[in-house]
Amino acid sequence: MAAKDVRFSADARDKMLRGVDILADAVKVTLGPKGRNVVIEKSFGAPRITKDGVTVAKEIELADKFENMGAQMVREVASKTNDIAGDGTTTATVLAQAIVREGAKYVAAGINPMDLKRGIDLATQAAVKDIIARAKKVSTSDEVAQVGTISANGDKEIGEMIAHAMQKVGNEGVITVEEAKTAETELDVVEGMQFDRGYLSPYFITNAEKMVAELEDPYILIHEKKLSSLQAMLPVLEAVVQTGKPLLIIAEDIEGEALATLVVNKLRGGLKVAAVKAPGFGDRRKAMLEDIAILTKGQMIAEDLGIKLENVTLPMLGRAKRVRIEKENTTIIDGVGEKSDIEGRISQIKAQIEETTSDYDREKLQERLAKLAGGVAVIRVGGATEVEVKEKKDRVDDALNATRAAVEEGIVPGGGTALLRAKKAVAELKSDIPDVQAGIKIVLKALEAPLRQIAQNAGVEGSIVVGKITDNTSSETFGFNAQTEEYVDMIQAGIVDPAKVVRTALQDAASVAGLLVTTEAMVADAPKKDSPAPAMPGGGMGGMDF
């Protein structure tokens, strides 16, 4: 086993604090509307420029092992906040640094670290409660756009694009961010349920110019097995012909005689029909066919359900307002499924998402959820250079996560104001144990840190800004707009943060910082000493003295 290097008490805390400071100082320059960028060297390709706190944090690895441990703990704060809320990573880092710094001073002065942590936890709970109580529900598309704009570093175009996407696909819909091939950033929305299977034969096309098959108000037959003969289907085909409506057949595969018969009928005009393969594979295919059945109020024809093809009647077929089939994709628009059935299915998928441990499964389940809930939107981020596109994509990702969080738990005044106002609730806490009270004091001071940093990045003295906002007791939403360097009503000015992001940042920062403050010893691998190289043999032949 390798030898270990051990550091104790003040020596350990000093090293750890230095690591915390190095990482936090690199991350906090990105905070606020006037935050700067950080350039990160890549082992290949162009350097990466970003204003995303967690991206910077993940790149930092220090040479000194003890300093690195401190840095890694704060990196954990940023990663955790990013995983839960998707934004607020820089705020969390600034809060963690403030709590650790103050905590280290108190511990050095001889205060009990465990009581100190208890005080930090009590104060954090009070502040979180206050933030949740202040949260205002997001009701309009404009408010959604405001949240997106603030998170995208004041980029209005991004904020409005996200609001538009959310309006189209709903809060459960999937919004993905991709890199565009052009310089423009654009939004592409697919309404209804789309799956990646196209028509089985080009003869099904109804619009030759666009190469698509469009079926208005069709019946939909959902079959989980292969169809190689249409004999068993004749009764239901005849019933569909009587109604004069088109028919879409979704099956594992349609081959040979069955496909030929359908094509001939389509060309003769007897039956308006189109056939596509079922999406997915294995169990996922079955689940997706069930989703389609629920969406269209149809019945999935499966032998294990005891339904045979020859017994299928018209009421067992699904219905939709319109179906559009392209070479690669099929979109079912406005299925007639019952709202209650669809909602039941959605909550079932949500429960599966909660339980799954596989990222791949989670992604696929979220796709299914979005398709049921109303659609998929793709934001394609464009820019003049690859570096610019990557930087912009980071901001769009942040804005998207912040917007989702805002819809979930509401919004609070932005720019660090909500944390500053939470001081009032924390100040009311009183403890008989002086060391616990010291922990409460630490959080009281730390709650100012994000606002101070935002002001500092804008070139304004942080303590003056904090003083001005604290003195104004008439309005709870009064704050500092760092973009214009004015004092405004933050909600009216549209400077808002999602409550979930602010809450998560504080909880994660306090959790990790509390652990760092209570550290008394640190253990790391001792540096390996390089053994000196063996001496070179002397020249000349042995035994000869010249």
Swiss-Prot record:
Stored InterPro entries: Chaperonin_Cpn60_CS, Cpn60/GroEL, Cpn60/GroEL/TCP-1, GroEL-like_apical_dom_sf, GROEL-like_equatorial_sf, TCP-1-like_intermed_sf
Pfam families in the record: Cpn60_TCP1 (PF00118)
SUPFAM superfamilies, sorted: GroEL apical domain-like, GroEL equatorial domain-like, GroEL-intermediate domain like
Gene Ontology CC terms, in alphabetical order: cytoplasm
EC assignment: 5.6.1.7
Keywords: ATP-binding, Chaperone, Cytoplasm, Isomerase, Nucleotide-binding
Cell location: Cytoplasm
Top-rank EC class of the record's enzyme: isomerase
Catalytic activity: ATP + H2O + a folded polypeptide = ADP + phosphate + an unfolded polypeptide
Biased composition (Gly residues): 537-546
Positions that bind ATP: 30-33, 51, 87-91, 415, 497
Main subcellular location: cytoplasm
Start and end residues of each stretch annotated as Disordered: 527-546
Molecular function (Gene Ontology), one example: ATP-dependent protein folding chaperone
GO biological process: protein refolding
Family: Belongs to the chaperonin (HSP60) family.
Xref: NCBIfam families: GroEL, PRK00013.1, PRK12849.1, PRK12850.1, PRK12851.1
Assembly behavior: Forms a cylinder of 14 subunits composed of two heptameric rings stacked back-to-back. Interacts with the co-chaperonin GroES.
Function: Together with its co-chaperonin GroES, plays an essential role in assisting protein folding. The GroEL-GroES system forms a nano-cage that allows encapsulation of the non-native substrate proteins and provides a physical environment optimized to promote and accelerate protein folding.
Descriptive protein name: Chaperonin GroEL
